[in-house]
Amino acid sequence: MADHKIIFSMTGVSKIIPPNKTILKDIYLSFFYGAKIGVLGLNGAGKSTLLKIIAGIDPNYNGKIVFDKDYKIGYLEQEPNLDPEKTVLDVVKEGVQEVVDLLKEYEEVNARFAEELSDDEMNQLIEKQGELTDKLEQRDAWNLEYKLEMAMDALRLPDPAASISVLSGGERRRVALCRLLLSEPDILLLDEPTNHLDAESVDWLEQYL
């Protein structure tokens, strides 16, 4: 990614909700790749609304927004919506779903070597295995379990086998934050990310960012 490249800008953005309440008025904002920006304001000042507009979640605004479509945006809401049927580990793994899928495909390919194959089938399988190996190495997939464990430990997540349905609001936020950080978005939007984090976790997050 090129330094000093503007990857997002908004021009004259306003947000009005019924009956006629102005939440945001005539906002101009641009930021470069790699920039770290804090949005400060009193409760109800429109901070969360601004982040939702940047994240593309709230399309109901006036003004103009331009951003590079090649960049992935990740957003942590104050009250994340997580699947209550999943475990903590299930949700965290969603942040590295592409790698998880590649590992599964790699295991399926390896399992096929136990079958009776023609020479052509064997050659195709070897070629496919090589392609998957290259992709996995590029993504440091062999260290995935360690990476997940370190992130979950740093953010003091509950037991990986715990159901999302039994977690408190603060625990859900930490799970969602862990998933988001592991997904490594180009634009990371965090709405009050240090809420429900202890001092050590806050320090880890600051170092990570």
What are these regions (language model features)?
Residues 1-209:
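ABC ATP-binding cassette signature C-motif
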